[in-house]
Design a protein with these regions (language model features):
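Short, well-ordered, mixed-charge alpha-helical segments that flank or form enzyme active sites
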Residues: 25-27, 58-61, 89-95, 148-152
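Conserved anion/nucleotide-ligand pocket segment
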Residues: 105-179
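Glycine-rich, charge-decorated loop segments at or immediately adjacent to ligand/cofactor-binding or catalytic sites
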Residues: 83-105
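Hard-cation-handling environments
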Residues: 180-185
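Glycine/threonine-rich flexible loop motifs
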Residues: 56-68
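A short helix->loop->beta-strand "cap" motif at the edges of active sites that frequently abuts
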Residues: 77-81
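Short acidic catalytic loops
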Residues: 48-57, 83-86
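Glycine-rich oxoanion-binding loops at beta->alpha junctions
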Residues: 2-47, 59
Length: 185
């Protein structure tokens, strides 16, 4: 991926914070003992609501889903509502493949107990995280229109914007889903 840094919006002068710039180790005060990478508390100061609008790729080990999880944990602790803009799963929602993550192997690139190709949208993942992991996040998911579970990205009629420099085409997302299993070997 590419580095995404904090900055200031040129039009409004409002500070912007990258969810990847300063991931911090949440440490032993977390309810669980796993390592939790969350937005820095100072990046949440003066926020009334956090709007999460990122394109996931339908694969357990794509980091936007983990970023969503830890963002949900952070805003829940800070009492900040979260709004997630739901987007199509580029791999569709009918095919679910691969084993579920073993809890003893959790990491930032393998967080939730979902199959490798999970078939969920980011909004559905947010609801799953909130319920399955008891995050207590004040969550609103803005539903999308026109997407059906049988649709792959090319069926959506939407322009493709690469979610990562390493995923330049819809076909690369499908390949990523299978080849990332080799990354840890």
């Amino acid at each position: 991926g590419e580095r995404v840094s904090h900055g200031v919006d040129a039009l409004s002068g409002i500070p912007t914070y990258s969810l990847f710039e300063d991931m911090v180790f949440a440490g032993a005060d977390e309810a669980s003992t796993d390592k939790a990478y969350m937005p820095a508390p100072e990046s949440l100061r003066d926020i009334d609501l956090l709007f999460f609008d990122m394109q996931d790729v339908g694969s357990r080990y794509f980091t936007y889903a983990s970023t969503l999880f830890y963002t949900m944990r952070a805003v829940a602790a800070a009492g900040i509502p979260l709004v997630v803009a739901d987007r199509p799963n580029p791999l569709g929602g009918e095919v679910v493949e691969g084993c579920r993550q073993d809890e003893s192997c959790r990491s930032f690139i393998g967080l939730a107990r979902v199959p490798i190709r999970h078939g969920l949208t980011l909004g559905e993942l947010a609801r799953y995280y909130n319920g399955a992991y008891g995050l207590g996040c004040d969550l609103t998911v803005i539903p999308m229109e026109g997407w059906e579970r049988s649709m792959l990205w090319q069926d959506c009629g939407l322009p493709f914007v690469k979610p990562s420099p390493n995923l330049p085409t819809p076909a690369s997302i499908l390949v990523y889903n299978g080849t990332c299993m080799l990354a840890g070997t």
